[in-house]
């Protein structure tokens, strides 16, 4: 991502007048520019698929019991989401502009300082030149901060060693990293590369929004403003609350809730490997998140509104109430 981003930055201009045409220029005139651009855009989608799988795996096997590692991971997730959001603004299409307008506007819900904060971030009274330039600057610097944080993430993981599916100590089963893990990892890397190249070479625009092929126009609002697919679940939670501040809080808490998970671990076992009821609830949570993702991409109309509200309630209820209580129930089942 950093490499493709670097090559894109060589040809991109962060000015409202030329940003859109510079992206067009990259796709049409730069050698393999189209490939670099779509690798970068779809690489972000692959990145998020890996992140979601990684977080899900951590939740399933109780890896969140390594507190420092887990909390840096939550911080990393926020940083990657911020980076992806700012990157989406750079092509300066309709969805770039209106996405930036809608999401930055959420900060105005903060009491007292809200409106000042939004104008400070915009660098003016609307999303304009100053906003685009600073987003480019932040989008360039954040990945390096993410890389540093990932290093610290690993540093803390190596304090304890990694977890395993059973949730028991791995010490007796440790083997050399090379050749065993290197070979195992090459398989995963090749499958990811296969998926990414297939996406980039066969349907590069599958996950994008056609509205972003229209240059940004402050006088014309697109009929349905929606973010990229990896933000839709959070967007659905935001929209399910009919109050601005409430929605913003729910949006932030939908990710921040991950930091609370270790303190809600009531089971006497670490992993879900031998806990069938918790397993069921975990997969219900996954289904709920997929439902939220679907709702986030739908218009705010009759059946979708109530489905989104129910899915949002279920999301918080599962994590905060149902799963901890079920864990206690499982403890009693095993007479522990």
From Swiss-Prot:
Membrane topology: Multi-pass membrane protein
Taxonomy, superkingdom: Eukaryota
GO molecular function: metal ion binding; ubiquinol-cytochrome-c reductase activity
A biological process from GO: mitochondrial electron transport, ubiquinol to cytochrome c
Chain sites annotated for binding heme b b566: 54, 153
Residues passing through the membrane, by range: 1-10, 34-55, 70-90, 135-155, 183-203, 245-265, 277-297, 304-324
Cofactor note: Binds 2 heme b groups non-covalently.
Keyword hit for DNA damage: no
Annotated positions binding heme b b562: 40, 139
CC per GO annotation: mitochondrial inner membrane; respiratory chain complex III
Keywords: Electron transport, Heme, Iron, Membrane, Metal-binding, Mitochondrion, Mitochondrion inner membrane, Respiratory chain, Transmembrane, Transmembrane helix, Transport, Ubiquinone
Locations listed in the record: Mitochondrion inner membrane
InterPro entries: Cyt_b/b6_C (IPR005798), Cyt_b/b6_C_sf (IPR036150), Cyt_b/b6_N (IPR005797), Cytb/b6-like_sf (IPR027387), Cytochrome_b (IPR030689), Cytochrome_b_C_euk/bac (IPR048260), Cytochrome_b_N_euk/bac (IPR048259), Di-haem_cyt_TM (IPR016174)
Positions annotated to bind a ubiquinone: 158
Record text on subunit structure and interactions: The cytochrome bc1 complex contains 11 subunits: 3 respiratory subunits (MT-CYB, CYC1 and UQCRFS1), 2 core proteins (UQCRC1 and UQCRC2) and 6 low-molecular weight proteins (UQCRH/QCR6, UQCRB/QCR7, UQCRQ/QCR8, UQCR10/QCR9, UQCR11/QCR10 and a cleavage product of UQCRFS1). This cytochrome bc1 complex then forms a dimer.
Function: Component of the ubiquinol-cytochrome c reductase complex (complex III or cytochrome b-c1 complex) that is part of the mitochondrial respiratory chain. The b-c1 complex mediates electron transfer from ubiquinol to cytochrome c. Contributes to the generation of a proton gradient across the mitochondrial membrane that is then used for ATP synthesis.
Note: Heme 1 (or BL or b562) is low-potential and absorbs at about 562 nm, and heme 2 (or BH or b566) is high-potential and absorbs at about 566 nm.
Family that this chain belongs to: Belongs to the cytochrome b family.
Stated name of the protein: Cytochrome b
């Amino acid at each position: 991502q950093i490499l493709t981003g670097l090559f894109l930055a060589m040809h991109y201009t962060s000015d409202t007048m030329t940003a859109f045409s510079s992206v067009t220029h990259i796709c049409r005139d730069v050698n393999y520019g189209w490939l670099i651009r779509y690798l970068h855009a779809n690489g972000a989608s692959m990145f998020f698929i890996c992140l979601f799988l990684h977080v899900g795996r951590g939740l399933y096997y109780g890896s969140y019991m390594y507190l420092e590692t887990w909390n840096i991971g939550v911080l990393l997730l926020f940083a990657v989401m911020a980076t992806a959001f700012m990157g989406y603004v750079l092509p300066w299409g309709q969805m770039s502009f209106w996405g930036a307008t809608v999401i930055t506007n959420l900060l105005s819900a903060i009491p007292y300082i809200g409106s000042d904060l939004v104008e400070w971030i915009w660098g003016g009274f609307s999303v304009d030149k100053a906003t685009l330039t600073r987003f480019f600057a932040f989008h360039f610097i954040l990945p390096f901060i993410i890389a540093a944080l990932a290093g610290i993430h690993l540093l803390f993981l190596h304090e304890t060693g990694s977890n395993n599916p059973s949730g028991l100590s791995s010490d007796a089963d440790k083997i050399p990293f090379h050749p065993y893990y290197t070979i195992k990892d090459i398989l995963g890397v090749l499958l990811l590369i296969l998926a990414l190249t297939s996406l980039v070479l066969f349907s590069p625009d599958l996950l994008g929004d056609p509205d972003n092929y229209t240059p940004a126009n402050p006088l014309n609002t697109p009929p349905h403003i929606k973010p990229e697919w990896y933000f839709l679940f959070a967007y659905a939670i935001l929209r399910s609350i009919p109050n601005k501040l409430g929605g913003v809080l729910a949006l932030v808490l939908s990710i921040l809730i991950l930091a609370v998970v270790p303190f809600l671990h009531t089971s006497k076992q670490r992993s879900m490997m031998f806990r069938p009821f918790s397993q069921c609830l975990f997969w219900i949570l996954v289904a709920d998140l997929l439902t939220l993702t679907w709702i986030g991409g739908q218009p705010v109309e009759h059946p979708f509104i109530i489905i989104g509200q129910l899915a949002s309630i279920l999301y918080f209820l599962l994590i905060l109430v149902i799963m901890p209580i079920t864990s206690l129930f499982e403890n009693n089942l095993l007479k522990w």
